[in-house]
UniProtKB/Swiss-Prot annotation:
GO terms for cellular component: cytoplasm. Keywords: Cytoplasm, Isomerase, Porphyrin biosynthesis, Pyridoxal phosphate. The modification N6-(pyridoxal phosphate)lysine is found at residue 278. It is found in: Cytoplasm. Its EC number is 5.4.3.8. This is Glutamate-1-semialdehyde 2,1-aminomutase. One of its GO terms (molecular function) is pyridoxal phosphate binding. It catalyses: (S)-4-amino-5-oxopentanoate = 5-aminolevulinate. Disulfide bonds: none annotated. It holds the Pfam family Aminotran_3. InterPro entries: 4pyrrol_synth_GluAld_NH2Trfase (IPR004639), Aminotrans_3 (IPR005814), PyrdxlP-dep_Trfase (IPR015424), PyrdxlP-dep_Trfase_major (IPR015421), PyrdxlP-dep_Trfase_small (IPR015422). GO terms for biological process: protoporphyrinogen IX biosynthetic process. Its cofactor is pyridoxal 5'-phosphate.
Amino acid sequence: MADSCTMTTDLNIPLFERAKAVIPGGVNSPVRAFNAVGGTPRFVRRAQGAHFWDENAQQFTDYIGSWGPMILGHGHPEVMAAVQAAALEGFSFGAPTEREVVLAEKILSLMPSMDMVRMVSSGTEAGMSALRLARGFTGRNKIIKFNGCYHGHADALLVKAGSGLATFGASSSAGVPQDVVKDTVVLEYNDVGQLEEAFAQFGDQIACVIMEPIAGNMNFVRASVPFTRRIRELTREHGALMVYDEVMTGFRVALGSAQSLYAQHIEGFAPDITVLGKVIGGGMPMAAFGARREIMEKLSPLGPVYQAGTLSGNPIATACGLKTLELISEPGFHDALHAKTGRLMAGFKAEADAAGVPFSVDHQGGLFGFYLLPELPSTWTEVMKTDGARFNRFFHGMLERGHYFAPALYEAGFVSAAHTDADIDKTIEAAREVFKTL
C-alpha cells in the first residue's frame, strides 16, 4: 500500500513541519495542504509518465497532473528535449523571440474565435487582463460571474453571491475591499432566469460576462447549451462581451477547446475573449488571452488598456508549450484521451453501483469529475449537497492504495496520454475495494 509508512518513518511529515515554519500553511497554493481532506500532503520528489514518487519513494498514479497542464504525462521525451534545447539558449531575455510568434500562430490556428493573442505567466493574470480589456473596450464597469466558477485570485473575481441582484457580490477573501467587488454581479450557474433578470436591470452597464464552459472548481459541471446560447444572445444584444475562461478546458477537452464543442450545438458560436492556461504551457508558467483584432488592438502598446509582464512569453515556457501543442494536434489524440477517461469513469460508476454507493460521473477529453450523488448537479447549490465526509474517506482509501486524486471535494480530475490501460485497471480495482468501505 502506498501509505504504509508509520508516523515515525513517513518522510513527508517532518518535511511538512519544516515547510510550515517558513511557508504559510506549508504550501504555495492552499489546496495542496490537505486541509479539506485531512492528513499530510505528499511531497513529490520526481514524476514520470502517469506517476510520481513522494519523499518516501512511494509511487502514485497521478490524476491531477499539476492541476491540468500535464496532458502528455510527466517527462515526455520530446517536450523535455525542446525545453533543454531552449534552456541552453537562455532563460529569459525581456525581449521578443521568434518562438513566441510561432506559439501565437499555433494557438490562433486552433482557435478561430481569436485574431490575436497576448502571452502572460498565469491563469490569474490572463483572467485579470481579460476583464480589464473588456472594461476598456466597452467603457463599462460591471461584470457578471457565476457562483462556483473560479477565474483566479484577482481581487475583482474573489466574489461570492450576495443576498440578491441588488446587493451585487460580497468579497470572499480578507483583504479585498467591498469597493473592489461592488461592480461584480454573481449569479447562479446554468440559471437562465437570473441571467435575464440581471441584463434587464443592468444591461447597458455590463462590460462582460465571464464563464467557464465546464466548471472544474465545482468538480465537473457543464454549462448547458441553452444557458450558453442565452449568454451569447444577451451579450450581443446589450453590447457586452462574452469572456470564455478556458484555462482548464483549453486544448484538454478537445483540440479546439470547449468552444469548438459548443459551436456544434449553437450556430455561429464564438466568445469575444478567450482565456487560456495550463495545457498551453505544458507544465511551465504560461497563460494567454485572445480575441478578435478590434478588441486586442485596445491593448498597449497599440491602445489605452495597459498590460505588461517581465516573464511574458518566456522562451523556455514557449518551447514547452509549443511542443505540447504540436504533439496533441496529432490526429486521434483527443478521441483516444476521451475514450481513456471514459473508461475510468465507467469503471468507477459500475463499482459504486455494485457497492450501493450513490455516484454520478461526467468527462470530456482528459477532464473528469464525480460526485457522491445519485444525479449530476448543474448548479453550485446542487453541488453543495454532495457528501464531504464520504468523499474524504474515498480520497484517503485511494491514496492508501497508490492513486492520487484532488485532495478537495470540488476539484476536477485529469487523465493524460501517459495513463495506460493497466494504470486505469488498477485504479478501478482500488476503487472497488474503497467503495465497499463507504
